[in-house]
Amino acid sequence: VPVRFGTWFWSMGHTPGYAVGERTDRIEFLEECKALIPYVDEINYFGHFNSPLDGRPNHVHHTGWVATRTATAPVLPGDIPAPTLDVLVADAIGGNTRFRSIDMTCTGNPRDSFTARNTHTRNAGEVSPRALYARLFGEGFQDPAKTGSQADPDLMLQQSVLSGIREQRQRFERRVGAADRARLDEYFTSIRQLETQLALQQQQPAALAACLKPQLPAEGPVGLEINVAQGNHDAMARLLVMALACNQTRVFNMAFNNALSSLRRPGTAYTHHTLTHEEAVDQKFGYQPEA
């Protein structure tokens, strides 16, 4: 089981033949992965995946990521037939942190998230650096650098209220069918996570030398313009680094774009997705330079 686990999602992100070379003795990062060259000795690269459909239809921009992350091909568009890998990892290692996982998306739409327990329980992503900061380092954050903190009586009351419904819950579960019981279990799992969060907020955190509460990010726009998405990505990534250092979470997911890759340059109507379909291949370079 990993100590920390995270995913970055960038749909339609690599041009075949321009990301990784064919060497077998070590990873050979090419033009589109030059930024990773300094870390070549610390990275394992996996590619050329294939997703057996088991007789099910291939739903474009959906089947691929679902099958890769759940090991099961979906039957219907929008179907997520099993938990994504990060959810299983979070179940194993995320129980003793304030947040079982942190999910972020750079598109401005919280539903552009690729982590879910099932079709009906998809984890929404934080869309702005300021919202992410408020969640991680705002109300409820216990700074390891400060000692002598006292339990918040409001938090203690919230925890006691949650604990007080357990008997009613158990009686109610005995009256419903298996499908409804499964849905209720998902709901009460989230309640248990909240109870854990409240309990941790009443404890003085262990000293963490690398933990430094960051500054509040500047207010800014969200959306699908590439410069906006990049700026929000960089700001949220910096907050994420400190969230991990402060042991606020051990599992995270970052979505740079949506499954259709709808990012676009300022002042243009063509999205990245449209360019991959319609832009001509440059005969000199062998790829679509704008895409």
Model-derived features with residue positions:
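Ligand-binding pockets and gating/stacking loops
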Residues: 1-291
